């Protein structure tokens, strides 16, 4: 049996990063996380750091702005997974440069973990973030770096507790806002499952230089069907308030961050069908639940039970 790749994470203590780091360590990959000293000692990160230590994760001190430490860290790994946050997406050119200099990386997973940025229609402010991710893709390809792009669509833990209701703190009990006509299908995946599928792809030749779409059939719902599922669970019919696209676009322009970001993402997915408006072609992509049928992913139906 071949040994498992050694994986270096950059941005591993962030929202989605910590789930993927955990999946890596639990599956037996030697797991390294690049951290700043300030992160190691940050009270807000202490439980994540402690959890990583218990899982045998190794910490490497370094920084995206310290090229030498970046190159030295990358030289210790076979695979690099970036899960840097929104504000650091553009800094990934530094990772690409360091990967080129190190010369040993078998695969790079840039910070994607959302929509497929090459196959979406978006408006600002989401448009700029998607454009940055697309430029990162083109640079990776131009430099000849082996890659996998993970398109995991929506994080279930972020959108389902409120049924994707902008500004809400809990799931609706009386009225529900439906953006557009509620018919385009969206995909919601549990963060732990995103971690599992991502790590399964690391040493899989079928995902090399491909987009890994996490689009399990049981987690793919139109918004209307999602509301109906929720209504069945709470035993109540909600008043559905449909917001036309023109009204939503006006609201995006008039809103401040982070609401405008959330609304522009929702416009892309719930109005324009950004998750499912295209077929996954073998020339560019593969689907995770088809590649890894043994993974028992958590369904949307199961996830919603905890919010009843």
Swiss-Prot record:
Q: What GO terms are given for molecular function?
A: oxidoreductase activity, acting on NAD(P)H, oxygen as acceptor
Organism's domain of life? Eukaryota
**Residues bound to NADP(+):** 11-17, 36, 45, 137
Which residues are responsible for catalysis? 133 (proton acceptor)
> What induces or represses expression of this protein, per its UniProt record?
Induced by wounding.
Q: Does the keyword NADP apply?
A: yes
Family from the record: Belongs to the NmrA-type oxidoreductase family. Isoflavone reductase subfamily.
Purpose of the protein: Oxidoreductase involved in lignan biosynthesis. Catalyzes the NADPH-dependent reduction of phenylcoumaran benzylic ethers. Converts dehydrodiconiferyl alcohol (DDC) to isodihydrodehydrodiconiferyl alcohol (IDDDC), and dihydrodehydrodiconiferyl alcohol (DDDC) to tetrahydrodehydrodiconiferyl alcohol (TDDC). Plays an important role in the biosynthesis of secondary metabolites. In addition to the 8-5'-linked neolignan DDC, can reduce the 8-8'-linked lignans, pinoresinol, and lariciresinol, but with lower activities.
PANTHER family hit by this protein: PHENYLCOUMARAN BENZYLIC ETHER REDUCTASE 1, PINORESINOL REDUCTASE-RELATED
Found in which tissues? Answer: Expressed in apical meristem and cotyledon veins of young seedlings. Expressed in vascular tissues of roots, leaves, stems and petals. Expressed in pollen grains. Expressed at low levels in cauline leaves and siliques.
Q: Provide a GO biological process annotation.
A: lignan biosynthetic process
Its UniProt entry gives the catalysed reaction(s) as: (-)-dehydrodiconiferyl alcohol + NADPH + H(+) = (S)-isodihydrodehydrodiconiferyl alcohol + NADP(+); (+)-dehydrodiconiferyl alcohol + NADPH + H(+) = (R)-isodihydrodehydrodiconiferyl alcohol + NADP(+); (2R,3S)-dihydrodehydrodiconiferyl alcohol + NADPH + H(+) = (S)-tetrahydrodehydrodiconiferyl alcohol + NADP(+); (2S,3R)-dihydrodehydrodiconiferyl alcohol + NADPH + H(+) = (R)-tetrahydrodehydrodiconiferyl alcohol + NADP(+)
- Annotated EC: 1.23.1.-
Keyword annotations of the record: NADP, Oxidoreductase
| Protein name from the UniProt record | Phenylcoumaran benzylic ether reductase 1
The record lists the organism as Arabidopsis thaliana (Mouse-ear cress)
């Amino acid at each position: 049996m071949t040994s498992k790749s050694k994986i270096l994470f950059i941005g591993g203590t962030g929202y989605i990063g910590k789930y993927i780091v955990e999946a890596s360590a639990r599956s037996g990959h030697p797991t390294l996380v690049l951290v700043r000293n300030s992160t190691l000692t940050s009270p807000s990160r202490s439980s994540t750091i402690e959890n990583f230590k218990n899982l045998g994760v190794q910490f490497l001190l370094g920084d995206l702005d310290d090229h030498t430490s970046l190159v030295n860290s990358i030289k210790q790994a076979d695979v690099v997974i970036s899960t840097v946050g929104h504000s650091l997406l553009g800094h990934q050119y530094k990772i690409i440069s360091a990967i080129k200099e190190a010369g040993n990386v078998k695969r790079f997973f840039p910070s994607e973990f959302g929509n497929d940025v090459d196959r979406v229609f978006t408006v600002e402010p989401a448009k700029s973030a998607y454009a940055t991710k697309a430029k990162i893709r083109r640079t990776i390809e131009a430099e000849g770096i082996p890659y996998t792009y993970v398109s995991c669509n929506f994080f279930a833990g972020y959108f389902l507790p409120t049924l994707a209701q902008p500004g809400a703190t809990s799931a609706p009990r009386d009225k529900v806002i439906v953006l557009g006509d509620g018919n385009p299908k969206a995909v919601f995946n549990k963060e732990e499952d995103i971690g599992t599928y991502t790590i399964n792809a690391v040493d899989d030749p079928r995902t090399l230089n491909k987009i890994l779409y996490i689009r399990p059939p049981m987690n793919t719902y139109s918004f209307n069907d999602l509301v109906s599922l929720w209504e069945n669970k709470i035993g109540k019919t909600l008043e559905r308030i449909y917001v036309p696209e023109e009204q939503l676009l006006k609201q995006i322009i008039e809103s401040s961050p982070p609401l405008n970001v959330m609304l522009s993402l929702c416009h892309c997915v719930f109005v324009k069908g950004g998750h499912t408006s295209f077929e996954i072609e073998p020339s560019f992509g593969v689907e995770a639940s088809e590649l890894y049928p043994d993974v028992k992913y958590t369904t949307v139906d199961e996830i919603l039970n905890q919010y009843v």
